A protein has these predicted regions:
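Metal-dependent phosphoester/phosphodiester hydrolase catalytic core
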Residues: 2-33, 38-532
């Protein structure tokens, strides 16, 4: 839990001792420990690494979770509160510590620690670490956002999603680290909730499908133990939102894909949200039961504002479902035709409160670039339906094509609020895609924005239809056989989005190459395809 103590608390002398640390990160460093009972803690406390996130001009969230037995429900920790010292320094050797304090790792939050390290200078990099039980954590590198309203030369942001553990290794993250991004934006499917499944697997999930807190903790630990994923957290601050698999496939509010008992599903959602909170460097309030607000903005000086949304927690039921399906607790229909309620203007993807919040943010944002960090593909897309060979269009019920009125509200808001240079970044579809966004009231007019879906870190999508249908769906680019991520580089005049594709996501040492690039021009909405 957050408890950044500005002044360093006095150290009880009877428990003080000085230790010499091993390990490259802290070689030769001396530090003292004031933790009562620290000697009783098991070793290997920092098995899950460290992370930073949600930078502000004067602060950044620092995260770790003490878990000497990371796959155990309690992480192998005693059921007691544990003091954890944190330090922020200007140098990697911690000779110039500028902020420090003691936070408490509480058993009811899985001994996770979220420190709001404040009093920092804007727009610069810092090093941080945690100390507990005579051990030092790995050293992470964080970054503060530029000063509010400051002119900023540039922003480099890598955006990614969908990292199914079983489908590949995390070579993509090694390449992200090499890009030295200011910020990493993760757009959902950080974990997958499925049971271990050997089909197409290069490695297996280590616990059965989670439904309770212990199960979700073990699943996050499985992912977080990966050294390449840890290295990406250690290299730069992240901003995250979730999609469905952080809880369960294709859920909508309180409805699971199987339309099971909503009360049972909300108990599961509460466990999943708590585990998500416990494992991510989020600047949000901890969850209360099955509720956790994660939509928020993040400013990068005068240059950019990210509006990070949650399209799962508050969405209405999927459209065009057969009557009585929910009541009968039968699985939802994921491919739908057109029906009366598809375009019902009252149907919502974000929920009314989040929609109002977004409307206000889009109207008041002072930023030159406005980046909507959302989960999936916004462009209206036709999908094949093997069950219906007729020419009638079919849509995915689970992405924005299943909530067209909600999507058009955002597009119209960009126009009416004169939002400066809007862009949408997304994930979810396990494919790279890029498209112009047009005003729904002037479909033949010039683009009002562009959207970029940045592939998947590992998760697969093998169907040939995605590329076949791409021209008809108006995609300027479509690639679903290559894994990877997107990189956004912007400055005051313009910038680019580059898609980075792995040679083979099933290899830890895979190389990477640019597979597409699009240029952006401030004041001229839309994307411009470049040749690689
Ligand atoms: Fe996914
Ligand atoms: Ca998804």
């Amino acid at each position: 839990m957050t408890s950044p103590d500005a002044p360093q608390p006095p150290r009880p002398p009877e428990f003080s001792r000085r230790l010499v640390l091993g390990g490259a990160a802290a070689a030769g460093a001396l530090f003292s420990i004031g933790a009562q009972g620290a000697s009783r803690l098991p070793s290997g406390l920092f098995s899950l690494g460290v992370a930073s996130g949600d930078p502000e001009p004067d602060s950044v969230i620092l995260w770790t979770r003490l878990a000497p037995e990371p796959l155990a429900g309690d992480g192998g920790m005693p059921a007691t509160s544990v003091p954890v010292r944190w330090e922020v320094a200007e140098d990697e050797r911690f000779a110039r510590v500028v902020r420090s304090g003691t936070a408490r790792a509480e058993p009811w939050w899985g001994h996770s620690v979220h420190v709001d390290a404040d009093g920092l200078k804007p727009g610069r990099a810092y090093f941080y670490r945690f100390l507990a039980g005579g051990e030092a954590s790995p050293v992470g590198r964080a970054r503060t956002a530029p000063a509010r309203g400051a002119k900023v030369d540039r922003l480099r942001l890598c955006f990614a999603s969908c990292q199914k553990f079983e489908a590949g290794f995390y070579a993509a993250w090694r390449h992200v680290v090499a890009e030295d991004p200011d910020l990493i934006l993760f757009l959902g499917d950080y974990i997958y909730e499925g049971a271990p499944n050997k089909k197409d697997a290069v490695r297996l999930h280590r616990n059965p499908e989670p439904i309770d807190l212990a199960g979700y903790r073990a699943r996050y630990a499985t992912y977080k133990l990966d050294p390449l994923l840890q290295a990406a957290h250690h290299a730069a601050p992240w901003a995250l939102t979730w999609d469905d698999h952080e809880v369960a496939n294709d859920y909508a509010g309180a409805l699971s894909e199987g339309n099971g008992d909503p009360m049972a599903f909300l108990r599961r959602r509460a466990a999943a949200y708590q585990a998500y909170y416990e494992h991510q460097p989020l600047r949000v309030r901890p969850p209360r039961g099955a509720d956790m607000r994660i939509y928020r903005t993040l400013d990068w000086g005068a240059l950019a504002q990210l509006q990070i949304v949650d399209d799962r927690q508050y969405r209405g039921p999927h459209a065009c479902q057969p009557a009585g399906l929910i009541e009968a607790h039968k699985p939802y229909r994921s491919v739908i035709g057109d029906c009366a309620d598809l375009r019902d203007p009252s149907r919502s993807m974000l929920g009314a409160a989040q929609e109002r919040w977004l409307d206000e943010r889009l109207a008041r944002s002072p930023a030159q670039w406005n980046i909507l960090g959302q989960q999936t593909i916004m462009r209206q897309s036709i999908v094949p339906d093997a069950a219906d060979p007729s020419d009638a269009p079919h849509y995915s019920a689970d992405n924005w094509s299943g909530y067209p009125a909600a999507r058009e509200k955002i597009f119209r808001r960009w126009v009416e609020a004169k939002t400066s240079n809007p862009l949408a970044l997304g994930g979810d579809i396990h494919a790279f895609a890029a498209a112009q966004i047009v005003d729904p009231d002037r479909p033949d007019g010039a683009p009002i924005a562009a959207e970029f879906v940045g592939g998947s870190i590992t998760s697969l999508r093998n169907d040939p239809d995605f590329k076949r249908l791409a021209p008809g769906n108006g995609l300027a680019f479509a690639e679903n056989m290559v894994r990877g991520y997107g990189r956004l580089d912007i400055d005051a005049r313009g910038g680019s989005v580059t898609y980075r594709g792995l040679a083979d996501a099933r290899r830890e040492d895979s190389g990477i190459a640019d597979i597409a690039r699009f240029s952006l021009e401030a004041g001229r909405p839309g994307l411009h395809v470049e040749t690689i």
